[in-house]
């Protein structure tokens, strides 16, 4: 923790530098960052699980306390308005007493609707950053989530501080423990629900604490890209297991995927081929490389796998140009990672907000940035048997390039995805996931 504490000082200094630059450019007095507030379920007296504003947790690891506010201008010590009501119904947040408290001045707020008493008296030149624009309007903010400020913050968020990198190494460490437990549960005959429980226990995080809904998919369910239903019965026969699951540390996410075969067979060989291809793509990551080019190179490798495993005929370029590889690998290679699983700024060319869209042929790619040092990205190639997409191939001449017998053979296994979390350094890549021993 001592090292994290030391890194935090430099982290806050960098965030202050960024804020000072953008508020001066936009003639603002500063930013007022709202942690957020609960959302009430329709016709109910209960709230949905609270999710903190990522711009708020960039400054402070306060993840579960709504109605907090942070005032920053890049010059003065940040001011934290910390919500601590008198409430006998719910657990009230403890008074902050952690390493980060030395870097903020703290004022306590006991009633959420009295925050105006603690905000700057002349709020006109301060910009509100948060979700609740109606609250901001009532409080008198004229500037709310201004595009220039948001683009600047999102663009620079891609460059992680040493504190952020340390947090993400820790979130990977926690997630790897869960993945090992889930793998063992799979081979011991667990159902999707049981595997999920083993994962959560190993990470010591609940379903509302992990950064996204875990994907725990057995057999054909692995062909559903965002499968989040958990079946209580263990399938028979047991063929395959795809797990896409992460963990959270101080608000920073990990996002890891593995695929396993229950027995040695053609599917296990395909997993090994995908694993080699994924590591080869990671080896080519370096500053100056365009993420789009990594994605296109992955399609070359997927095309070769389709040929090698007798799933399709033809040459690699033809399979790519005709969109056949996109049927088997329909999603993007990965995305930026950080405060959010799909971290902001993946399409920004510069701090002014210039947008670079994904190529027309690959609309689901979530990142078009050029790699730079201290960026963190996922690399997650996949190959799936998705009937709704394969049906499109049967409607034209491309059907003759697909070996449907091979497709039928692999259909019960669902699909494959392998995902690691990688830090780009100036002179190397750091595969946080593999460095922790997760094969």
Swiss-Prot record:
Keywords: Dipeptidase, Hydrolase, Manganese, Metal-binding, Metalloprotease, Protease. Belongs to the peptidase M24B family. Bacterial-type prolidase subfamily. One of its GO terms (biological process) is proteolysis. NCBIfam families: PRK13607.1. Splits dipeptides with a prolyl residue in the C-terminal position. Its cofactor is Mn(2+). Pfam families: PepQ_N, Peptidase_M24. Mn(2+) 2 binds at residues 244, 255, 419. GO terms for molecular function: aminopeptidase activity; metal ion binding; metalloexopeptidase activity; phosphoric triester hydrolase activity; proline dipeptidase activity. It catalyses: Xaa-L-Pro dipeptide + H2O = an L-alpha-amino acid + L-proline. The keyword Manganese applies. Gene3D superfamilies: Creatinase/methionine aminopeptidase superfamily, Creatinase/prolidase N-terminal domain. GO terms for cellular component: cytosol. Its EC number is 3.4.13.9. Binds 2 manganese ions per subunit. Mn(2+) 1 binds at residues 255, 335, 380, 419. This is Xaa-Pro dipeptidase. InterPro entries: Creatin/AminoP/Spt16_N, Creatinase/aminopeptidase-like, PepQ_N, Pept_M24, Peptidase_M24B_aminopep-P_CS, X-Pro_dipept-like, X_Pro_dipept. SUPFAM superfamilies: Creatinase/aminopeptidase.
């Amino acid at each position: 923790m001592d090292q994290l504490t030391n890194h935090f000082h430099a982290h806050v200094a960098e965030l202050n530098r960024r804020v000072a630059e953008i508020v001066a450019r936009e003639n603002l007095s500063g930013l007022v960052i709202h942690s957020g507030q609960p959302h009430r379920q329709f016709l109910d007296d209960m709230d949905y699980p609270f999710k903190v504003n990522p711009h708020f947790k960039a400054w402070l690891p306060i993840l579960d306390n709504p109605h907090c506010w942070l005032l920053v201008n890049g010059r003065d010590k940040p001011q934290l308005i910390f919500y601590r009501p008198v409430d006998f119904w719910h657990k009230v947040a403890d008074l902050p007493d952690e390493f980060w408290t030395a870097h903020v001045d703290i004022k306590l707020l006991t009633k959420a609707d009295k925050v105006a008493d603690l905000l700057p008296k002349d709020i006109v030149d301060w910009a509100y950053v948060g979700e609740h624009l109606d609250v901001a309007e009532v409080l008198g903010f004229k500037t709310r989530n201004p595009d220039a400020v948001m683009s600047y913050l999102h663009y620079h968020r891609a460059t992680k501080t040493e504190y952020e990198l340390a947090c993400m190494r820790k979130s990977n460490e926690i997630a790897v423990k869960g993945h090992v437990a889930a793998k063992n549960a799979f081979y011991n005959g667990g159902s999707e629900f049981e595997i999920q429980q083993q994962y959560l226990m190993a990470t010591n995080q609940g379903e509302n604490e992990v950064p996204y809904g875990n994907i725990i998919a057995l057999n054909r369910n692995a062909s559903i890209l965002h499968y989040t239903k958990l079946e209580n019965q263990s399938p028979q026969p047991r063929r395959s297991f795809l797990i896409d699951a992460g963990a959270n540390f101080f608000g920073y996410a990990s996002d890891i995927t593995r695929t396993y075969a229950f027995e040695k067979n053609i599917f296990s060989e395909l997993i090994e081929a995908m694993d080699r291809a994924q590591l080869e793509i990671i080896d080519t990551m370096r500053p100056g490389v365009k993420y789009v080019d990594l994605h296109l190179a992955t399609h070359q490798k997927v095309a070769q796998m389709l040929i090698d495993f007798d799933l399709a005929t033809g040459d690699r370029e033809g399979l790519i140009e005709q969109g056949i590889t996109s049927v088997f690998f329909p999603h993007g290679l990965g995305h930026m990672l950080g405060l959010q699983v799909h971290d902001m700024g993946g399409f920004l060319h510069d701090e002014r907000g210039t947008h670079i869209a994904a190529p027309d042929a690959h609309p689901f790619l979530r990142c078009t940035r050029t790699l730079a040092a201290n960026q963190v990205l996922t690399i997650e190639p996949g190959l799936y048997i998705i009937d709704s997409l394969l049906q499109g191939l049967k409607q034209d001449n491309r059907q003759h390039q697909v070996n449907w017998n091979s497709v039928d053979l692999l259909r019960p296994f669902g699909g494959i995805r392998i995902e690691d979390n990688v830090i780009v350094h100036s002179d190397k890549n750091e595969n946080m996931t593999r460095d922790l021993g997760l094969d």
